[in-house]
Amino acid sequence: MTRKNTTTNPWAKFHGPNLGYVIEQYDLYVTGAGSVDPELQELFEIFGAPSFQDDVVTGDNTATHFSPQNTGNIEKILKVVQLVEQIRSFGHTLAHINPMEDAANGQSLLEKAMNELSDADLKAIPAKTVWQDAPEGIHTALDVIHRLKEVYTQTLAYEFSHIQDSEERAWLHQMVESNSLRQPLSNKKRTALLKRLTAVEGFEQFLHKTFVGQKRFSIEGVDMLVPVLDEIVLEGAKNGVEDVMIGMAHRGRLSVLAHVLEKPYSHMFAEFKHAKIEGAVANSGWTGDVKYHLGREQVVSNEEVSTRVTLANNPSHLEFVNPVVEGFARAAQENRKKSGLPEQDTSKSFVILVHGDAAFPGQGIVSETLNLSRLNAYQTGGTIHVIANNAVGFTTDSYDSRSTKYSSDLAKGFDIPIVHVNADDPEACLAAANLAIQYRMLFKKDFLIDLIGYRRYGHNEMDDPAVTQPQVYKKIKNHPTVRAIYADQLQAAGVLNADEIETITQFIQEQLKSDYAQVPPADTSDATIHVKVPDVVAKGIQPIDTGVELDSLRAINEGLLSWPEGFNVYPKVKKILERRKDALEENGKIEWALAESLAFASILQEGTPIRLTGQDSQRGTFAHRHIVLHDTDTNETYSPLHRLPNINASFSVHNSPLSEAAVVGYEYGYNVFAPETLVMWEAQYGDFSNTAQALFDQYVSAGRAKWGQKSGLVLLLPHGYEGQGPEHSSARPERFLQLAAENNWTVANLTSAAQYFHILRRQASVLGTEAVRPLVLMTPKSLLRHPLTLSTASQLSEGRFQPALEQENLGTKPNKVKRLVLSTGKMAIDLAAEIESGKHEYNLDEIHIVRIEQLYPFPAEKVQSIIKRFKNLEEIIWVQEEPRNMGAWHYMAPILFELAGDKVKTGYIGRPDRSSPSGGDPFAHKAEQELIVAHALDVKYNFRQDKLEIEVFSN
């Protein structure tokens, strides 16, 4: 008997949950117990009861003409439909996915539903009634249940029910239910897999015995991580992927380096012995890092395909590498050689992130990075996440490290499919890897593999884990390795015999011994002890002429003030832009935002791409930039920098999510992988940048010294004390200055639009060279439109960036100057504004002011040459608006002492030490600021001093 044609049997198109709904509606129709869907009511009136027919089979699998009307089994049908969906949704709760535990058991929701249905009930229901795509050989609902339990409750378990897209969800279920993922491997691939596991285990055990007590953070217990990465990398290569980016912590890193990235064993052993070996490529900076933090780049290939694999350098700050590697991938995906936005091709590269089971739910950077995955400015076409799940974080059990059942549960909130797999089932692990790469390449979205194993030793090899997990480690001690388990399986299946397995083991051991024999004795020469900064770094950025011809600037400005005909610019913005029309003419003045746009355009015309991101970067936090215009009628956007002539480089400016750490990491990674690009991150206020402090500490400031990893990232950090309270005043320059050493970056606080123009162009000029380094700018807020920060066209068309500037009209009588005031940024402008105001009388002949535009590296020669002009100088004073324990004072003090020598005093004027960067009372702030200025200029003026704390001292 065959299924009726759907033209005469409309019920044939209803299956699964839809079928259950139809049957419920028919029951209501017959009993009159409730309202029925009008369309279904019409079908019931025409065709009668839902009727389902399937092939007739005999024996135990009998399934005959079946209708709720002639069987009275409506409730049973509904229960079967519900059971099928429960197996799909909750089968993972019964699966054997933890090698250290028995398969899940006990009365679960699933088991209760199964107990309510007898085998006879299930045999009476045709398979396709509840499973439309039931494969051949599946005839009854009983067959369906057996098959789905086999799929969903073994060593592979799936969580797909949270996926919102029905097409994706259907594809995932079809992939796992069709059994195409679990096709038997060829004997050749099985043998290769055993060899790989033997190499991984042999390598770890060799290190364990040869370098006793040395830290290596063994992978043992989750050995299948290496074959899983192999599978993803090579399947990606088959799909045409050119770059695979991997981010991971120290656990298992050495084995991944040795096997996935093909770092020679001999080079690994040399690092353990502290020996030099011929052919080893240095992949670290002058200070270096421990071996399990280092990365590597390698072209990986087999007989058919090849791809470049990059394992990112990584600190011990878990998961902070995640956004960095995402930035790598985006940079590799984009073509930046045309004007307009970069052209992205997500098939060119993808990311694999290896997480820890404690760190994945524990570190907030994970969630921040996951949130980037579908944002236009940051998406990379899908990341494959692998949780190397050994069920413990150092000494902390999982029940103390997360509030969820699985360590992967965070991913559900980001619509990411999840596969849990038993790390002791190698072929199941490869199936998970295969599903992950197929999904990523098809849907361009993230996928997560929860690789559940154990940790055979302690957190490191000097740690005894039995102290804190005695029962677990009794089990682990007696538990066979995955290599041994798989070897037994292959032997039982007749793929290999015992002698052949032993031959594989011996081959690996001989290779390890042979490579170890190549390693010379430890190098104890002075060269390995003394750290020397490379000359090109120590030399610093040399003076560079960065002016742009005036005619070019005028042409650029004209283009910046143009937009398509019919494009309706917001009236207020239009007025702001129109004020810039004559800025480059005689008597014109250039404000900060225009100087920036002119710098951007000129940099683009010289072939350097630009990427700028931040929480409000298109408009600018202070409504000053307006680099992306919005049509008031259509909300379409337009950026004049995309349409300027003579540009062969991309420009992108994006508003970022409310994240600092992930976005800073991403932009750093983008810049590392696209060194020719001017990459800038702008904080909404500099105060908020400290939520990315780990990125500044571990990557931006120290990446080159540790790993030889160059970056030209620009940080724009709005800074300045304006009475707006402790969260809107300070970018904490003291922290960047504390990290400043070995010419690792430039820290500047500028006082004019021209200076900003020139320093951006200087930074662009060193990109991709050995002279490159990050640029940390304390950018203005109130100074954005301040008259004293405006510049003339000639100041942009001529000259270069000046690390120090002298206050105009001061110091004209050198022999009378007694006090030299040094300051930076807004404080310097406040001093200049007070002088210009003419409110008070000063003995200006006795004062000279120098603005320190570049705090680090400090322009010592320039300042020293100024000091030498003043033969009667009595004191050098540092003036700042920040409290004494913040700002630049503690950085400047030893510099001033050295500059002053024995005969000249040094001093400080500013706020006293405080625990909070700024007060919250704007009136108190104003009074304090006036007092600081008064003392700095030595004004004989009666200020309200009774309740104000201003510190003035000299040595």
UniProtKB/Swiss-Prot annotation:
It catalyses: N(6)-[(R)-lipoyl]-L-lysyl-[protein] + 2-oxoglutarate + H(+) = N(6)-[(R)-S(8)-succinyldihydrolipoyl]-L-lysyl-[protein] + CO2. Disulfide bonds: none annotated. One of its GO terms (cellular component) is oxoglutarate dehydrogenase complex. InterPro entries: 2oxoglutarate_DH_E1, 2oxoglutarate_DH_E1_bac, DH_E1, KGD_C_sf, ODO-1/KGD_C, THDP-binding, Transketolase-like_Pyr-bd. Gene3D superfamilies: 3.40.50.12470, 3.40.50.970, Multifunctional 2-oxoglutarate metabolism enzyme, C-terminal domain. Belongs to the alpha-ketoglutarate dehydrogenase family. E1 component of the 2-oxoglutarate dehydrogenase (OGDH) complex which catalyzes the decarboxylation of 2-oxoglutarate, the first step in the conversion of 2-oxoglutarate to succinyl-CoA and CO(2). This is 2-oxoglutarate dehydrogenase E1 component. It comes from Bacillus cereus (strain ATCC 10987 / NRS 248). The lineage of its organism: Bacteria, Bacillati, Bacillota, Bacilli, Bacillales.
